[in-house]
Amino acid sequence: MAIYLTELGDSHSFPSPYDALNDPNGLLAFGGDLNPDRILNGYHQGIFPWYGPGEPILWWSPSPRAVFDPLAFKPSKSLKKFQRKQQYKVTLNNATERVIQLCSSTRSAEETWLNEEMQTSYIELARRGHCHSVEVWHDEKLIGGLYGISVGQLFCGESMFSLKDNASKIALWYLCEHLASNQGQLIDCQVMNPHLASLGAFELERDDFVQKLLSLRDRNINLGTFEPQVLQGAVS
């Protein structure tokens, strides 16, 4: 069966997310480029780039959408016990470029979509104040983290990595605690998987997700939320 997709041109506009295909789930458009302005415009509409080696740039808006409620996130007893023992240091926006690079390099070439061009775009978005990271440290070595895009009171998670057990889980835990105390309302995780489900992610159908996005994207998060800082004290 033929698939008809919109090819993006020079304009940074996108089709409506409601035009996304059901199979493959959420595929909306192809082409264009990875200009940071285009990427940011996509996030403001619930659209993100994701494609593999040898593929054109593909743009997605899947349904259902995997999300976390930062206010409702509850770390497991075992994770709390682990962190009390290890006392990993956790920071915000202290090494965003390195986190982005490690999210790519810790995966095989076949597994990662985060190629050099994509990394360059997200690093530029970080320089502009739109892309943020959480870092987990052990003995001054970066052992885990995550990064994503802030859109008002919505945080769009992009990728995470772990070099030691539980490091990415701890990054997510501290991110949720930090957002919950600074008017962050929702974390978008794009597509559900068993790992996200085990951490408490739940799904929203497209209508519900888009309505939340529209209500949150123009709301201000607390001033200073994404200033570089240590988050270790944010978790009791």
UniProtKB/Swiss-Prot annotation:
GO terms for cellular component: cytoplasm. Pfam families: Leu_Phe_trans. Transmembrane segments: none annotated. GO terms for biological process: protein catabolic process. Keywords: Acyltransferase, Cytoplasm, Transferase. InterPro entries: Acyl_CoA_acyltransferase, Leu/Phe-tRNA_Trfase, Leu/Phe-tRNA_Trfase_C, Leu/Phe-tRNA_Trfase_N. Disulfide bonds: none annotated. The keyword Cytoplasm applies. Its EC number is 2.3.2.6. This is Leucyl/phenylalanyl-tRNA--protein transferase. The lineage of its organism: Bacteria, Pseudomonadati, Pseudomonadota, Gammaproteobacteria, Vibrionales. The gene is aat.
